[in-house]
Amino acid sequence: MALAPERAAPRVLFGEWLLGEISSGCYEGLQWLDEARTCFRVPWKHFARKDLSEADARIFKAWAVARGRWPPSSRGGGPPPEAETAERAGWKTNFRCALRSTRRFVMLRDNSGDPADPHKVYALSRELCWREGPGTDQTEAEAPAAVPPPQGGPPGPFLAHTHAGLQAPGPLPAPAGDKGDLLLQAVQQSCLADHLLTASWGADPVPTKAPGEGQEGLPLTGACAGGPGLPAGELYGWAVETTPSPGPQPAALTTGEAAAPESPHQAEPYLSPSPSACTAVQEPSPGALDVTIMYKGRTVLQKVVGHPSCTFLYGPPDPAVRATDPQQVAFPSPAELPDQKQLRYTEELLRHVAPGLHLELRGPQLWARRMGKCKVYWEVGGPPGSASPSTPACLLPRNCDTPIFDFRVFFQELVEFRARQRRGSPRYTIYLGFGQDLSAGRPKEKSLVLVKLEPWLCRVHLEGTQREGVSSLDSSSLSLCLSSANSLYDDIECFLMELEQPA
């Protein structure tokens, strides 16, 4: 009689497991904060600190053990202590990814930067309709459905998960294997995928505030960036196309309704936490863009675009826009600019922006479509004023979809940067110059109208890598000029000695 095949052990669900571990009282710093057990804290010490101990990683290790990921199967005893130390960063990353993906918890406070007691405070979410299942637990990615080539290649799904979302960064995996393996590990750790980006924005639209509500531009105050005015005919030499009419307005780029980012009100605790608990932290959508608009170096607008698509316009936004429509970003009026020549040219440029510049996130790429007569040049580089070289400036063709940023390229460069295989930090700041060629030799900050876009996901990943000690600074080229602490007293003493000498 043939034996029935042994059934695999049921997969451990993170939410139920974590609640049990909190109630066990076996972990220092992991505890409930209220009698109703709706609010708890998790110790969260940065692993680069010198006072890190085994207890600081105990809860992260416990999750790896519960998943069967530790200890590794080997003969001749357990792994050495140094092997466990090398795995701690990965344990913490997997724990963080599981904590976010389960949707059973919402972060109330982030005190991980507290030098005396680093921790985070979470509460149970009221969204009980989100039930845990094997698909929602994405702490460790399964075999990828299609791995992108290390250099370029057609877009395709990165991971095989379907119930996933972009996550905030954790430490990238230690370099092991070839460059392709490193890129795959980085993508797995960051939970970035084509359909993940779409799912984080495009599923089940929820009502939100009308675009622009509660988000106002910065007032035009302070001194204007200096510099002589432009020659009278300079503007029309490159800025405005000579086509007689803007032509028919293209159809919307999106093929389906896109969702607005999840409303913070949907992440309230299931039960009221203790009075000491503060409100939930409003973390931007993983694909959010930090938008800065500058008029000749002067910042006139800063806002976060959390929608999968947006349109840059000049003039008041349409009050009838729906939550599922592209988010509208309005250029502020240059009326308060003190330089009248700059004001006149800026106004002329902005009038030709209509019917707008459209941005849309498609999978791992950000696409742009210029619909107005005002020419727009784009490039990707470092922050303003940095010495990091930028990509060659390119003109956005009119009424044509153009990819201007690829997350896959960024993560490949980030892995090389972390492995010390790349001198400069990866570039992720996107510049859009309206009416002036960014490659003309002038500083970008001197452009009449400059839009700076920073993907939130890229910034936090790079900052996390830099906090691990990776830097683009070359110590061999640094020459620090410091005064001697005693130089002043030495000069005074020499002066007094000269006074005592006979003439």
Swiss-Prot record:
Keywords: Acetylation, Activator, Antiviral defense, Cytoplasm, Disease variant, DNA-binding, Host-virus interaction, Immunity, Innate immunity, Isopeptide bond, Nucleus, Phosphoprotein, Transcription, Transcription regulation, Ubl conjugation. Belongs to the IRF family. GO terms for cellular component: chromatin; cytoplasm; cytosol; endosome membrane; nucleoplasm; nucleus. The record marks 167-168, 189-190 as: (Microbial infection) Cleavage. Changing residue 188 to A: No effect on cleavage by enterovirus 71. The gene is IRF7. The lineage of its organism: Eukaryota, Metazoa, Chordata, Craniata, Vertebrata. Changing residue 185 to A: No effect on cleavage by enterovirus 71. Key transcriptional regulator of type I interferon (IFN)-dependent immune responses and plays a critical role in the innate immune response against DNA and RNA viruses. Regulates the transcription of type I IFN genes (IFN-alpha and IFN-beta) and IFN-stimulated genes (ISG) by binding to an interferon-stimulated response element (ISRE) in their promoters. Can efficiently activate both the IFN-beta (IFNB) and the IFN-alpha (IFNA) genes and mediate their induction via both the virus-activated, MyD88-independent pathway and the TLR-activated, MyD88-dependent pathway. Residues 146-156 have a biased composition (Pro residues). There is a cross-link at residues 444, 446 (Glycyl lysine isopeptide (Lys-Gly) (interchain with G-Cter in SUMO)). It comes from Homo sapiens (Human). GO terms for molecular function: DNA binding; DNA-binding transcription factor activity, RNA polymerase II-specific; RNA polymerase II cis-regulatory region sequence-specific DNA binding; sequence-specific double-stranded DNA binding. This is Interferon regulatory factor 7. Expressed predominantly in spleen, thymus and peripheral blood leukocytes. One of its GO terms (biological process) is immunoglobulin mediated immune response. Changing residue 214 to L: No effect on IFNB induction upon Sendai virus infection; requires 2 nucleotide substitutions.
